[in-house]
């Protein structure tokens, strides 16, 4: 049985014999090689440890960097927020001043006034002295004409003519020259004072000049 095994699988004796036959120098050469291999094995272990350490450091850096960035970003945002809040009132003050200046009422421009007491003029002549019968066309008599385009204050052709006649009559009656003539005639008919003099007014002054006084009077309208 052993012979069959030896035939099939071989024996270890030839290998032992070869090991014995090998020279001593070869064994010496192999021993340093084995030692170097043995010495290199720890280095490989150290390299693997370094690699594992490096991998651990990489993991720590990757996980820690976002938190640091987030913390720095939040700190920067907090610093910028007060600056923006402090700058906001300065920006809001300027529009208030502008709005205050815009709301100030501007002084109204003085418009030229109209003298309502002055009589209107037409062709260099007071309008009250014009006779409506002297107009040839008389446009206010045309069919469809608006009387208010030619007469104001409810006047028409006939009431306007009556008003003008009355105004001319009043002005004629209150003419200063006519008034002085009438007053002179009335004074001439009065009896003379004793001593041929006029009665002095209080204060020793005579009667003022009636002509000047009448000139200062405005005729009624």
Swiss-Prot record:
Compartment list: Nucleus
Domain of life, per lineage: Eukaryota
Biased composition (Low complexity): 60-92
Stretches for region Disordered: 1-114
Keywords: mRNA processing, Nucleus
GO biological process: mRNA processing
Chain intervals with Basic and acidic residues compositional bias: 14-23, 93-105
InterPro entries, alphabetized: Fip1_dom, Pre-mRNA_3'-end_processing_reg
Acidic residues bias spans: 42-59
GO cellular component, one term: nucleus
Membership in a protein family: Belongs to the FIP1 family.
Name under which the protein is recorded: Pre-mRNA polyadenylation factor FIP1
